[in-house]
Amino acid sequence: MAEPGEGLPEEVLALIFRHLSLRDRAAAARVCRAWAAAATCSAVWHDTKISCECELEGMLPPYLSACLDHIHNLRLEFEPSRKPSRRAAIELLMVLAGRAPGLRGLRLECRGEKPLFDAGRDVLEAVHAVCGAASQLRHLDLRRLSFTLDDALVLQAARSCPELHSLFLDNSTLVGSVGPGSVLELLEACPRLRALGLHLASLSHAILEALAAPDRAPFALLALRCACPEDARASPLPNEAWVALRRRHPGLAVELELEPALPAESVTRVLQPAVPVAALRLNLSGDTVGPVRFAAHHYAATLCALEVRAAASAELNAALEELAARCAALREVHCFCVVSHSVLDAFRAHCPRLRTYTLKLTREPHPWRPTLVA
């Protein structure tokens, strides 16, 4: 009698299995010899997402361990408040550090609540170990890692990962511990870096000058998060520095996320006219109307995405209508307050590239769902 997978080529099985969860891949490998061979081939594991919430606990040896060498890009999710999930994530990272030459991309995501006063030293030590071993690492995304990142991690990446193309450190922590000096060392050690995510306090005039250097490879994305007290006290960045950076990298896109910790005077320092802002997220405790109007006047040629969290008002409606009339390149706009019908009409009329929006005319139960444009 023929085995269940005998009639399907291994490459077809691999194409199917690569979309399965870790637990389902393990189950598929037990069906028959053909499926076992396909489930453990490199094509299945090249891009892998692993959740430590349930599927990894107790499963690392021997099945996953045998396939780690095939992983090039890993997205690892875990829940730091649950000890089994956290332990499984750390174990996987430490094993990966011992066999990491082939790793090209690592993305870590925390789920659930982080325990109070948890510095995450055990998790960060595992990340250090991976960075120290993965000399071919090209992409490191720590935006969803809910622990304070520091200079030591950046310097480890600078020393050990010269091939880095992207590094995102702009996570949701309320303490900024990455100084501009370590970022400068990173830029010098990683000449191919083309995407960088930072808290505002980690950026400096010298960094903008380094990015604008004539021998610098094309730089595509700078994501800046302004969410902690250090960001509010950051030194101002002159508009002339942004002019020079934009001239050196005409395709540069900047993403700005402004959180309640930023007072009005700091918002004014951040929103410089020459910044090529492609995405602007405003969640301010003070005036939001002024920044929206500023964006309408200075970012019309570059702004593709806008997110606003503020109290509803006639002034905000008027500012949004002005922005809609000026920013024809907008592809998405999300306002988490009730807006007038004229605001909705303005975005529909003036933004032909709009693909998704959250513009509610009446209060609805949360979460508010966006509308997709056909």
UniProtKB/Swiss-Prot annotation:
Print the keywords alphabetically. Answer: Ubl conjugation pathway
Output the Gene3D superfamilies linked to this UniProt entry.
Answer: 1.20.1280.50, Ribonuclease Inhibitor (3.80.10.10)
List the Pfam families.
F-box-like
Q: Which SUPFAM superfamilies match?
A: F-box domain, RNI-like
Specify the superkingdom.
Answer: Eukaryota
Q: Which GO terms describe its cellular component?
A: cytosol
Q: Has the keyword Flavoprotein been applied to this entry?
A: no
Q: Which SMART domains match?
A: FBOX
Q: Which cysteines are disulphide-bonded? A: none
| Record domain F-box: where | 2-48
Q: What does this protein do?
A: Substrate-recognition component of the SCF (SKP1-CUL1-F-box protein)-type E3 ubiquitin ligase complex.
Q: How does it assemble?
A: Directly interacts with SKP1 and CUL1.
Write the protein's name. Answer: F-box/LRR-repeat protein 8
Natural source organism: Homo sapiens (Human)
The uppermost taxa in this organism's lineage are: Eukaryota, Metazoa, Chordata, Craniata, Vertebrata
Record gene name: FBXL8
